[in-house]
From Swiss-Prot:
Residues reported in the UniProt entry to bind Mg(2+): D151, N180
Function: Catalyzes the acyloin condensation reaction between C atoms 2 and 3 of pyruvate and glyceraldehyde 3-phosphate to yield 1-deoxy-D-xylulose-5-phosphate (DXP).
UniProt cofactor(s): Mg(2+); thiamine diphosphate
Protein name: 1-deoxy-D-xylulose-5-phosphate synthase
SMART domains assigned to the protein according to its UniProt record, in alphabetical order: Transket_pyr (SM00861)
Pfam families referenced in this protein's UniProt entry, alphabetically: DXP_synthase_N, Transket_pyr, Transketolase_C
One GO location term (cellular component): cytosol
A GO MF term: 1-deoxy-D-xylulose-5-phosphate synthase activity
Amino acid sequence: MTETKRYALLEAADHPAALRNLPEDRLPELAEELRGYLLESVSRSGGHLAAGLGTVELTIALHYVFNTPEDKLVWDVGHQAYPHKILTGRRARLPTIRKKGGLSAFPNRAESPYDCFGVGHSSTSISAALGMAVAAALERRPIHAVAIIGDGGLTGGMAFEALNHAGTLDANLLIILNDNEMSISPNVGALNNYLAKILSGKFYSSVRESGKHLLGRHMPGVWELARRAEEHVKGMVAPGTLFEELGFNYFGPIDGHDLDTLITTLRNLRDQKGPRFLHVVTRKGKGYAPAEKDPVAYHGVGAFDLDADELPKSKPGTPSYTEVFGQWLCDMAARDRRLLGITPAMREGSGLVEFSQRFPDRYFDVGIAEQHAVTFAAGQASEGYKPVVAIYSTFLQRAYDQLIHDVALQNLPVLFAIDRAGLVGPDGPTHAGSFDLSFMRCIPNMLIMAPSDENECRQMLYTGFIHDGPAAVRYPRGRGPGVRPEETMTAFPVGKGEVRLRGKGTAILAFGTPLAAALAVGERIGATVANMRFVKPLDEALILELAATHDRIVTVEENAIAGGAGSAVGEFLAAQHCGIPVCHIGLKDEFLDQGTREELLAIAGLDQAGIARSIDAFIQATAAADKPRRARGQAKDKH
């Protein structure tokens, strides 16, 4: 059977306008095709799978009921938005998702008018949708703003800040909680769906509002009794008291895979005004048994065999930096009972699975709450414990005030194990760790290290752990150059680098993983190459020595040039009145799209070839500038 025949209905509903022309009784068939196409495509290309499988019916219902793109759908994070991309004219390009020049991993305003807000980080959707609703109200535009947020996203403090604000504004906002963690309990069935339809209907809504005005004004006692009765009825089927107290009309929970219930309820809610909250229960990985059984494993996948019962095993090889961290954490925890492990909902990604199993009483997953994670660690440190916060570079940005105010200002011994530093690859600019050196370097009391290989990563983690103050070790995604970590742990002398290659003319100062490429270039041009190790404090003695014995200095880092490690070197040399030319190689003042890590390093000029080009050009430029200076010097000598 050809793809056209297998996905005939999906092809006919390639845009929301065409979808809305379909008879409602054809939508279950469309859902089946959409789920099948999503499975087939992602199994070939890789990508985020389980979340999207769980939102197929919800996505169809939203585009069927609301007039997108005039009505705004804001998807929180965006992992669950693959069905949305398919139904908004991007089906043919789905195989390119997360690839260089392909579809973005997340909703992206530059990609489609149906992506009304760019996302990638969690818990932002309610704030954005509320802003859109208020903007529309100011211009008297009759649009609907809908935020779709998962139960994980709702653990983020920003989501509750937005909920608190929305309830006070009486904005025309609908929030949909996509609850895919709890199983569908017995009360989420026919009775609950029926009651949700009634409670969201026009008749009930009008009676409720009329009763509020009439009884509330003339018979407040009767109104209070009626209100309590209503809450009692709602309480039998919905855990919505919190949202009602915040000023929302709460409906649900309803079955997120029942298209009839979804469409009826959404139509009713579309016709209401003010802040509304709909609780929808879905199953992550819906329709594909292995993903339903293990949604965590199938959250983000590479290419895999649909007929297999499990994902392919990764090829054996040297450990990734994440695995090096996970092993060190367990080894250190066995030696020091003061060690505590903290993660903001990234147990698997940050390498804490084994630690959580071996030391469950010392493992804390705080949810998507980076600000809380950092101050929580500060509180533990203030009581004599040694917390380790395992966090992605891009997510540490969300806790910057806490890093300064609660940790560094009090000089508390919190170790930050910063994963995904630098360019991360397929997830694109929302997940790149391009700025951590820049935003940490200016904070007093911080100790900042960047390992060049797996063994240095292990030893730096130990160095930071025993340090009496805040420390950070930042390392990239994936594997290193293949240096096997030593079982022993030895602290590096703080603020000391090492010369790895002796040459003349040019001194290359490498910070972190670019060292391997720098050494290869240094061998070719006969340069000196230093492994700096520490971004703060810098090895000032080594920098002065190299400045005094070389014609030029080059710094290399996988971080933004602005404010990064190279900037620190330049600032120090300027303060010492050294007139030596300096070239900074790093990430330029731009956001890079998605691609493989290797592709992005090449685009950024941080692969071996790119570093060589920059250094060759710098040598030529400084040599040309030296000729007039030498000529002037020779003329002075003659006089």
